[in-house]
A protein has these predicted regions:
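Secretory targeting signals
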Residues: 14-83, 87-88, 103-104, 122, ...
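Terminal transmembrane helical anchor/hairpin motif
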Residues: 93-188, 192
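Interfacial "coupling" helices/loops that link adjacent transmembrane helices in transporter permeases
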Residues: 1-17
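Membrane-helix interface residues
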Residues: 7, 78-79, 189
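Residue-level marker of motif borders
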Residues: 1, 74-75, 170
Length: 192
């Protein structure tokens, strides 16, 4: 960050954030335009309603803003740009793997069909799934899964494997938390 005399650090942080958000959204819209053109000519029409497509588009825009907020926070934490890029890549990869694993655990059914051999031959029996998460562990997985942008990205790509009703609120909360932390760190940071 370059501190310009006469400007508060909060304004500098927010201007950097807004610039990054605009750049991220420009990349997103370019990508969406290319996919739209490609899809019109080479893919079948979508089975989703217009409302669902608009909702997913808004979620993807908020997802871009959430990741941009996270990357801006990381840029404040580390002065070295190369280190920031490496750490950002590792964090995004780690969050993606963590989110994927959490979603897989949350998708487990509560009951499963199990073949049991009896005197009359094989019988199909419904039993409780030992992999199904319950209690506090399930709540922790659900809350973490709802807040992390990488989990939201997995859910959007799966087209609503798990309920996405509150996704927009969680992304706004995540964005606000990242920005508040980033602003407070920049305000306390000793600069040369």
């Amino acid at each position: 960050y370059k501190i310009i005399s006469g400007y508060r650090r909060t304004k500098i942080y927010l201007s950097y954030l807004i610039t990054c958000i605009i750049e991220g959204l420009m990349c997103l819209f370019t990508y969406m335009f290319i996919i739209l053109i490609f899809g019109l000519f080479f893919l079948e029409p979508s089975s989703l309603s217009t409302i669902e497509i608009l909702k997913i588009s808004i979620e993807v825009i908020l997802l871009t803003i959430s990741f941009t907020s996270l990357f801006t926070l990381l840029a404040v934490l580390f002065a070295d740009k190369t280190l920031t890029v490496v750490i950002s890549t590792i964090i995004v990869f780690g969050l993606s793997v963590l989110s994927f694993l959490m979603l897989e655990h949350l998708k487990e059914p509560e009951y499963i069909n199990q073949n049991v051999i009896s005197d009359n031959g094989p019988v199909l029996e419904i039993t409780k799934n030992p992999k199904y998460l319950t209690g506090t562990k399930r709540k922790v997985y659900e809350v973490t899964n709802d807040i992390l942008p990488s989990s939201i990205a997995w859910r959007i790509s799966d087209l609503s494997v798990i309920d996405r009703n509150n996704v927009m609120y969680y992304m706004i909360i995540f964005t606000l938390i990242c920005n508040l932390i980033g602003i407070s760190i920049l305000n306390k940071k000793q600069l040369r």
